[in-house]
Every structure is written in structure tokens, then in C-alpha cells.
Amino acid sequence: HRCYGEHLSVTSNERISPVAAILLAGGLATAVSMGVRSTMGVYLDPITVDLGISTGAFGFAIAIQNLVWGLGQPIAGAVADRYGSARVLVAGGVFYIFGLAAAGAANTSAGISISLGVITGLGLAGLSFAVILASVGRLVDESRRATALATTTAFGSLGQFVLVPLTQSAIDAFGWRQSLILGITLLALAMSSVWPLRSRSEQSAPSAAKGGGRAILRIAFGYRSYVLLLIGFFVCGFHVTFIGLHLPKYLEDAGQTSKIAALALATIGLFNIGGTMAIGWLGGRFKNTRLLALLYGIRAVAFVGMVVIPMSPEFALLSSAVIGVVWLSTVPLTSAIVLKQFGPDHAGILFGFVFLSHQIGAFIGSYGAGIYRDAYGSYSGYWWLAALLGVAGAILHLFIDEEPYHNLKNPPRPRELNTGLLAKIWNRRKAVGAVTSTIGVMALLGVWSYLRIDANSELAGQQAAVICALHLPFGPLG
């Protein structure tokens, strides 16, 4: 094999890792980190019942986790770009372990929010996709990068497939507090395996901007396709966290057992292994943006099915299989597009901002769904919202350009960052139409809310207000 990193400086203290070691290290870290993260859904019932807190309170803790995770990822990515990924991954693992241990000692909703929310969120910022995929992308050459990213992502689904039912069994046998020891042990193992990811390429890719992370960010936020990619990945975050956290409860509300609910999450993980690997292969042969549009469209259809088709154990597993095929398949494609656009030198910080957008969507997907169910006793409206966002995501990706920014006829000019991303997006004429459309969709959804609830219900007026408050970008109108 030609080792990926022929431009690396090889010394007695640092040798170039073979491809298998890179993928195994990245894959194991991803499997454990994402696998443990995927078990949060099976903890919802036992924690809320034991502590006497609401679904919304638990959803808020996980929403905080996603927000802290997202906010920390650009920082973790920038540190990894400069000092190497392994140190960041180990630091993330330490926070992750401490967060789970603190959760085991928590007795209030505030304790859960601090432990599973803030501390675990910091751990995930260091030990998650943004850092791992950036490292793998740097160490693997472009010809096999899509497959390598897909393989690493697929390990995350493998972790979900194995750990969700295993954790459910541990909860049933020992209780939710003691079951956290399983995640702590596996995280310690993952931390010890990340050293093959310590090497950093010293080459200067043609697409890398000179002047460090701030310079590349000025260019990235001036590139419309990168900004659209951020918005698209917001939809992914909304979908994944809403389903990962609330699918078990939704199925139990529909009359399914906790075993079926846990098996449904595991089925998503199992089928995503094949789906992600297939997407990695397709990503090397077709435009990634078109594949992403297809994935979001399939999600939308699957979400509609969850509402309109009567639930049964068989349908629960069948729909989970369909969702699983497109579950994390968006991650390697989105990551590959960023690498195509800007090269590998600043992948960590650029991935970090993409995943920050993902986690903002995750915050709304987890917290909003919990509030919605507490208020109305059903998740139906949220499934429809997820479907609408899937359609929007599919359309959005048709307008994203994969070309390296420096190959464009009119390369993006560096933008000043002091006015913030929102101002940059708002100043774009096309975005005005997008915002107007969003407000229109949410207004229609509010009207739909009145029609879906019995006219005599006192909740009818509140439902539309809650939807608008959660999803209009500037809060409720009026």
C-alpha cells in the first residue's frame, strides 16, 4: 500500500499509520461515541419515571447536550487542525465519561441537564464526527476519501446497532444508573485506540487559504454553497435527534413494547451500515449533492408513513429499516463536499461549523418534540414538520455547487465575520425568498394545527403558538 500521507514528515517519534489502522481507530471511536449517544432514547422513560420529571425536561437536557456539542465543535476542530486530533479526542472522552458518571448520581432535572447536557455535550464536541472525519479525511487521499469517510461513519451505526439493545438489557437487569457503567467502560477503551489519528499532514493543499482558520472562514462564509450546506445539515440534525431521542416513546405511545422500541433504534443502526457503505461507493461515482437530495426526499416519505400508516411491530421495524438506510448516510457526503470545496488543511474547523448547524437543528428536534408531546400527548405534528423539512432539504441541495471555490469563475471574496452568519445570510437576495417561504410554511402548519385538534379542545389555540414559537427564526409573530 501507498500510505496516505506521502507528504508527511516521518521521524522516529511519528510514523505514518497504515490505512487499516486509521479506519479502525476512527471507526472504533465513532462506534463508541455515537453508539453511547444513540442510547439516550432508551433512557427517557426510566429516568423520567425514576426522577419524576417530564418528557420535556429530559428533552431539554438532550437539547442542551446537542447545543453544547455543536458550539464546541468548531473550537475542537480548530484545535485539532493545529495540534492534532488524538489529543482532542482523548480530552473529549474524559468529559464524556465524567458526564455519564455525573448522570448516574443525579437526582433532579437540573442534575440531568448539567451531566447529560453540558458535560456530555463537551465530551461529544471532542469525541465525534467533526474531529474524527476531519482526521481521516486528511490522512486518506482523495481517490478513496469518500469510501473512507463512509466506512468511518458506518461504524457509528454499528455502535448504535450493538449498544442500544445491549443498554436496554442492562437497564432492565440492573437499573438505569448502573447501566451507565457500560458506556463509561467502552469510552475508556475508545480513548486508548485513537493514537493512529495523531499524524497531521504538513502539505499545503492548493485550495487551502493562507493565514490560518480565520482566513478560510472568511472565504467559506462568502461561498454560497457552503452556507447552503450549513442550512441543509440543520435539517439532518433535526431529523436524527428527534428520531433518536423520541422514536422509542412514540412507538410506546402507539402501543408497542419497550423491547420493540429499542429494537427499532437498533434496526436503524443496522440498516445504516449498509446504507452508508453504499452511499460511500455511490459518492465516488455521482454528484454528492444529488445523492443528498435523494436521501432527504426518502426521509420525508418515510416520516409521512410513520403518521398515516397504522403502527404494528412489523411496520415499526420496516419503517426503521427504511429510515436506517438514509440515517447517517448524509454525513460522509456532506463531509466530502466540504473537502472538495476547501481541501483538507482546515477540515476540522470547517466541519465544526457544519456540525454546529447540525446541532442547532438537533436542539430544536429534541427539545421541541418533548414540549410538543407534553402539551398534546402526541408526536404526530412533529412527524409532519420533519417531513416538510425533508422536502426543503431535498430542494436546497439541488442548488449547492461541489466545485473547489478557487475553480469558480467568480471565486467568493473573503467576508468579514464580525457581523455574524445571520447577517450574511440575510443580505442575500435569494435568502429573503427562503425566509419568506419558511414563514409561510410555518403559518400553514399553525393553521393545520387547529384542524388536527378537536375544535373543543383548549389546547387548539396553544398548539399553533408553540409550533410558531419553536420554529420561526425570530420567535412567534404578534
Task: Report each predicted region and the residues it spans.
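Extracytoplasmic gate region of multi-pass secondary transporters
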Residues: 40-44, 223-276, 365, 440-456
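Helix-loop-helix hairpin linking two adjacent transmembrane segments in secondary transporters
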Residues: 152-200, 378
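Residue-level signature of mid-helix packing/kink "hotspots" within the transmembrane helices
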Residues: 38, 66-74, 160-161, 269-277, ...
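Conserved MFS/SLC helix-loop-helix module at the cytosolic interface between two early adjacent transmembrane helices
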Residues: 71-109
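Helix-to-loop junctions at the C-terminal end of transmembrane segments
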Residues: 72-84, 276-287, 373-374, 477-478
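Cytoplasmic helix-loop-helix junction between adjacent transmembrane helices
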Residues: 116-154
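C-terminal transmembrane helical hairpin of 12-TM major facilitator-type secondary transporters
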Residues: 268, 286-337
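Hydrophobic core of transmembrane alpha-helices in multi-pass small-molecule transporters
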Residues: 31, 99, 111-127, 234, ...
